[in-house]
């Protein structure tokens, strides 16, 4: 809600504009054409959805117009044992997790002062943020989309691409999917998955080449691809670096680390610059 995302009578709004009329409706990869969350879920699932009304089965959707309005349902959700099998929500919901529910001591976050950003978002907001970061000194490069969409970017070429950047460039490196390609080489519905899986492969190689660098992922589908490729089994949110920018600790079968995540369609133009300064300054 602090970022203008609210739900009223089941309708989701972005800064007062219905979701299907907002910037999300113009998203190249996943345009949203429905503002009613119940109908949006019904397009993908036959599971019944109830609004603000507790039921034994199905999906329970809560209206939320302010941070204060999150208090009551969040207390019920987090303090019930097995009533809720799966909880979904925005980053703001993390603030409502009761401290007593966390048994582990808070970790001391240690990240290097290098920041590598993987962006699979084609959103106008993200594009402006990448441009601002490049102007501020980031090394910003497109991945070779003409090869990516044809499945022709080999592991060897990917490693060569990564190693082509100097040590200085890798101190603040942004790799994005904004490069040009022939539209006839790929179906639009396959583009999102292709980008996310490619970014996942990049993340895997970057972890080997730059194991200590802080890694930031932009775009929900991109994050999914990274999680899949790194074989991440658990992700525990640690803190919000900025509103909606979450630092999470992850573990997989043989290592652990941190990921910074951000959805594509929000934040001011200087957001990446502020994140980089935080990384430079330490936690």
Which stretches of residues belong to each language-model region?
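Accessory terminal and edge-of-domain segments that mediate assembly/interaction
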Residues: 28, 35, 46, 50, ...
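Active-site histidine-anchored catalytic micro-motif
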Residues: 1-20, 25-35, 212-213, 217-269
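Catalytic cores of soluble, metal-dependent hydrolases
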Residues: 95, 156, 162-163, 167, ...
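General beta-strand structural signal in soluble alpha/beta enzymes
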Residues: 48-53, 61-64, 85-90, 95-96, ...
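Redox- and metal-dependent alpha/beta enzyme cores, enriched for Fe-S-associated oxidoreductases
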Residues: 108-195
């Amino acid at each position: 809600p602090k970022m203008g995302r609210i739900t009223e009578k089941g309708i989701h709004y972005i800064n007062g504009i219905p979701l299907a009329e907002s910037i999300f409706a113009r998203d190249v990869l996943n345009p949203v054409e429905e503002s009613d969350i119940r109908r949006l879920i019904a397009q993908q699932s036959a599971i019944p959805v109830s609004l603000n009304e507790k039921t034994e089965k199905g999906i329970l959707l809560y209206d939320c117009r302010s941070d204060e309005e999150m208090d009551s349902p969040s207390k019920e959700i987090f303090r019930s044992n097995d009533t809720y099998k799966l909880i979904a929500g925005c980053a703001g919901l993390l603030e409502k997790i009761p401290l007593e529910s966390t048994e582990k001591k808070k970790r001391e976050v240690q990240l290097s002062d290098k920041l590598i950003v993987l962006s699979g978002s084609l959103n106008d907001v993200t594009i402006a943020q990448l441009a601002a970061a490049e102007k501020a000194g980031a090394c910003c490069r497109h991945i070779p989309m003409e090869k990516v969409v044809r499945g022709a970017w080999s592991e060897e070429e990917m490693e060569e691409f990564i190693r082509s950047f100097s040590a200085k460039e890798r101190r603040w490196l942004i790799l994005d999917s904004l490069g040009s390609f022939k539209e006839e080489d790929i179906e639009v519905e396959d583009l999102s998955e292709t980008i996310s899986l490619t970014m996942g492969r990049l993340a895997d190689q970057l972890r080997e080449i730059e194991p200590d660098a802080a890694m930031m992922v932009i775009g929900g589908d991109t994050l999914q691809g990274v999680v899949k490729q790194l074989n991440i089994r658990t992700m525990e949110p640690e803190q919000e670096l900025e509103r909606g920018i979450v630092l999470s600790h992850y573990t997989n079968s043989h290592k652990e680390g941190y990921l910074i995540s951000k959805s594509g369609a929000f934040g001011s133009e200087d957001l990446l610059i502020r994140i980089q300064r935080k990384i430079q300054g330490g936690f």
